From Swiss-Prot:
Name of this chain's protein: CRISPR-associated endonuclease Cas9
Cofactor stoichiometry and binding remark: Endonuclease activity on target dsDNA requires Mg(2+).
Assigned EC number: 3.1.-.-
Entry's free-text remark on domains: Has 2 endonuclease domains. The discontinuous RuvC-like domain cleaves the target DNA noncomplementary to crRNA while the HNH nuclease domain cleaves the target DNA complementary to crRNA.
List of residues binding Mn(2+) 1: D10, E765, E769
The organism of origin for this protein: Listeria innocua serovar 6a (strain ATCC BAA-680 / CLIP 11262)
Biotech applications: The simplicity of the Cas9-gRNAs RNA-directed DNA endonuclease activity may be used to target and modify a DNA sequence of interest.
A GO BP entry: maintenance of CRISPR repeat elements
Ligand binding (Mn(2+) 2): D10, E769, H986
Active site, per annotation: D10, H843
Keyword list, A-Z: Antiviral defense, DNA-binding, Endonuclease, Hydrolase, Magnesium, Manganese, Metal-binding, Nuclease, RNA-binding
Record function comment: CRISPR (clustered regularly interspaced short palindromic repeat) is an adaptive immune system that provides protection against mobile genetic elements (viruses, transposable elements and conjugative plasmids). CRISPR clusters contain spacers, sequences complementary to antecedent mobile elements, and target invading nucleic acids. CRISPR clusters are transcribed and processed into CRISPR RNA (crRNA). In type II CRISPR systems correct processing of pre-crRNA requires a trans-encoded small RNA (tracrRNA), endogenous ribonuclease 3 (rnc) and this protein.
InterPro entries in alphabetical order: Cas9, Cas9-BH, Cas9_PI, Cas9_REC, Cas9_RuvC, HNH_CAS9, HNH_nuc, RNaseH_sf
Amino acid sequence: MKKPYTIGLDIGTNSVGWAVLTDQYDLVKRKMKIAGDSEKKQIKKNFWGVRLFDEGQTAADRRMARTARRRIERRRNRISYLQGIFAEEMSKTDANFFCRLSDSFYVDNEKRNSRHPFFATIEEEVEYHKNYPTIYHLREELVNSSEKADLRLVYLALAHIIKYRGNFLIEGALDTQNTSVDGIYKQFIQTYNQVFASGIEDGSLKKLEDNKDVAKILVEKVTRKEKLERILKLYPGEKSAGMFAQFISLIVGSKGNFQKPFDLIEKSDIECAKDSYEEDLESLLALIGDEYAELFVAAKNAYSAVVLSSIITVAETETNAKLSASMIERFDTHEEDLGELKAFIKLHLPKHYEEIFSNTEKHGYAGYIDGKTKQADFYKYMKMTLENIEGADYFIAKIEKENFLRKQRTFDNGAIPHQLHLEELEAILHQQAKYYPFLKENYDKIKSLVTFRIPYFVGPLANGQSEFAWLTRKADGEIRPWNIEEKVDFGKSAVDFIEKMTNKDTYLPKENVLPKHSLCYQKYLVYNELTKVRYINDQGKTSYFSGQEKEQIFNDLFKQKRKVKKKDLELFLRNMSHVESPTIEGLEDSFNSSYSTYHDLLKVGIKQEILDNPVNTEMLENIVKILTVFEDKRMIKEQLQQFSDVLDGVVLKKLERRHYTGWGRLSAKLLMGIRDKQSHLTILDYLMNDDGLNRNLMQLINDSNLSFKSIIEKEQVTTADKDIQSIVADLAGSPAIKKGILQSLKIVDELVSVMGYPPQTIVVEMARENQTTGKGKNNSRPRYKSLEKAIKEFGSQILKEHPTDNQELRNNRLYLYYLQNGKDMYTGQDLDIHNLSNYDIDHIVPQSFITDNSIDNLVLTSSAGNREKGDDVPPLEIVRKRKVFWEKLYQGNLMSKRKFDYLTKAERGGLTEADKARFIHRQLVETRQITKNVANILHQRFNYEKDDHGNTMKQVRIVTLKSALVSQFRKQFQLYKVRDVNDYHHAHDAYLNGVVANTLLKVYPQLEPEFVYGDYHQFDWFKANKATAKKQFYTNIMLFFAQKDRIIDENGEILWDKKYLDTVKKVMSYRQMNIVKKTEIQKGEFSKATIKPKGNSSKLIPRKTNWDPMKYGGLDSPNMAYAVVIEYAKGKNKLVFEKKIIRVTIMERKAFEKDEKAFLEEQGYRQPKVLAKLPKYTLYECEEGRRRMLASANEAQKGNQQVLPNHLVTLLHHAANCEVSDGKSLDYIESNREMFAELLAHVSEFAKRYTLAEANLNKINQLFEQNKEGDIKAIAQSFVDLMAFNAMGAPASFKFFETTIERKRYNNLKELLNSTIIYQSITGLYESRKRLDD
């Protein structure tokens, strides 16, 4: 008889815990065969384990390398096209000129022609370098001279311009003749005063006076931030977040955020240097009005003048080649300053002369010019050298202005706009076309080599198929800047670009999402927010708005006002509903959503009757889509022509100038396509009219009484005909979480194969912390920087009075002290920084309702303040006393909006029974789409058979569980999790997931729709909306394990018995567990990318085929694909066979796998034979069960798991939590101090047997003896850190009683040759062994 079993999964980003358990809560156990070289032919194994693996990485590095390759290739192509244009004429002048240029990189004896790169003779070469010390000398001469020049010189100048053509940050024409910062800043001030004339008249804004000091500040070599601060000081009364400050931010090159100054709903950042500046500005002007356009033009002109002033340093009348002349001036100044510096050093610091001017290893001039020294390091070195030396003021002043000994090629050359280079190119062509007619004929082609960029919607010009390209051709042949429109189908490529760029709906993975500015999407956002807004009438009755009222609000407010405020809604209630003193709940000062696109389209001239007519919905949605996808005005114009029969030319012209950004999360089909089977209404229909219930989107799609949930499940991508790899690849989510999902699916497949039949239940838990996004990781980085900025804005001196650092701020107690500006959050009294352990860390929303240990839910307060607050959010009395202070913290960025809302929740009725039920429900029921996707894949893999009526037959229950339930279970029964001890906790969690899920569904079968994927009960097991009943029910679920000794159903079946706890505890103490680290054949880059200089090193890899590293340098540190153990013959007369480990690099892998024997013979091995292939993390076992994992061909990692008795795990749990406010953990470790000696004895015994780091162990024992009577908190932290000593994996250094214990590295791999290699399946249930000492 097949016994039912459950698979529990705990899925993470670098681990998957799994467990297979019976109905009686024990693990399945079997004797499993061991194949290969093993004395034991079978081992009894518990069916639980952990799959460990390296976290999946994003493709960011690959993408950057690909982008760099394309950029370099396109640069080479531009030069090649220029040579093609010059080829015929150049062959008449110097037939070998281009050959010599292409050979110029090679060493002399490998060049095909003359060893001189430019000219055939040494005399010409010397003459050229004498006349033109830099390329800019040549460019300037050709721009200013009308005489005929050598064609080779013309080519060299044009090639330099085209190769380094400048940036495209400033679009359109650039007025290089007018770079007077002072004059243009005056124009900006005049425009500012004109635009804000009405504000100046009514006193809300001040009239600004021109200040000559501003121009001086703008051109100074100081940071943008310092420029902004100094300019604002010249205008007293102007605030850093004010209107004027934002325009000055634009001018100095920073972001201007106009959200607050213009009172906008969304953040509105624009930056002059950004490619998208024009589009961003148009979007902003659409919100604030075109009357501000002239002011932004004035600000952009001022910004351009500042940029150009930093590049062009020569007077306007001196030359027509201002850029080249400025570079020549930089060269001449460098030469003069260098002469003066040398003379000064010889006179005042003769002993330093050699170091500064000859030693390239130092940060002196030699290192700066010929070594790797950066400008900042050179300046720092020279300043330190010259300080306090009489007469060095001149040099130090230039260093401080960053204008000392500047090189020709510097980082700020990236700021040179392409228009400056273009101006010189056009001048050279104009001067020389008189003598070389082909230049005139090809003028546009040559110019296009500077100005042309491949349109973004065309994408890479791939040859053949490419996973990154979507280009559609009109005609075959080579694509050039001047023929691209003949060769490429812009329209079709643009459509394909739309498809490629559009994201998929979170809920309906086949559907494209709507643009963020879609009228339909904005309508959904408005109604989704409005449906949860309540009002209290004059009689004190609280009501939601009816469907009719919502429609009226939408038409009378949102269609009339771009931004709807709370006071507008109050006025509406007074006028329409005759409520004299309404109180609005569920809304701050204004709505977050708006119907802004409607107003934009009205403004460009589309009539209201067109906008309001449902017949035009599709047209209007298409218009918004075009304006979102395309940035190119010509492309927008072309795409909009399809609507010319409805919209006139004037309207279309205005639409061309508009551009939207951003995409929503939902599709049109989700909002308006799928319909409830009974009512035939869409989700948007319900949002507009859901009288009595007023459900929002999440409630509608999760409501068991509606069919949206089942429709969404059926719409999920089918997995029937796809392999697991491609199924997971199609999921929305990070590469890290996808890798975990893929591993978990493979584990389930193997477990089902071993068991021989499917499980009754599969329980899936995905911990939230395992879905950390890039943003999340950034947010968790060092706290000091953000704190310092916020404290400064807040105007506090607390960081100066009590300095701290990132290490200290990891302590939440101290971090909260600074975030609260040293004040008790509930009482306002000063906190004593020296006695922070005496205060409580309080959860604003109590832990009994929500497991939220984030800073957003924590405050530091006295015990008295905590008691006054009680087991609820802060009462109204505390809110009224402290709200002003909390608002200051919120405005000063020391508190998030979420935290402020938690603290002030009493103003909005406090924690209602419905809130409490919702908080607890949120901890129980998994709502994340990524988890539902995993459940869907498992559901489709096992529940694919249909009954006679076509309904899915459910063979396997797929249960999604949240970690809160298992956490509660662990807490109640002291089954403590200490992650630092070993990796067992992943499998423990998987096992407990199975225990909790099975028991819950036995005791509360009505919970199946909440937990089991694909279950829909078409009734509400809480009649009406009894929030109190729901809250009590959910609370009981969280606590029933502790409250009930035995639960029996009506048939007498025991559903839960406390004796089962003994089984659970026994299982949790099992020592045998299958830990498997995923072996990896390494792929990717061949070696480190850094090119090493030429040298007599056999280790260097040639940069290209036939490039001798001794002549051209090379690459080092080749990356290993895997290692191999080989056997080969040694000796002359008598052959002796030896074994050796060698690495096969990623670069060599293909050749090795093609013919292993030939490859090894080429390496010099006689009669070679491959004994074993060893990918990274291959596991091998030495004497007494000591295990290691291969890290590289010459280093290993620890391979054993340390297991501690339960009482020592309990000790470590309390040690890790001794800072918690209730003091229980601190009391525990204080009263069990002597147990730390026992813990150390266990660690020492394990280390002597497996870790083998004797010197470190002796040091650890000595430190313990010296500190064992010391501060108990220091002991606790030291022993938590000590767990790293024996942890499986790469050795790591750690601190023990503030002393660093350095890592012990395992570099001697000779023992591997006498070990047993262990090959494991993904679960570790199957294994085979191979002895290498035979």
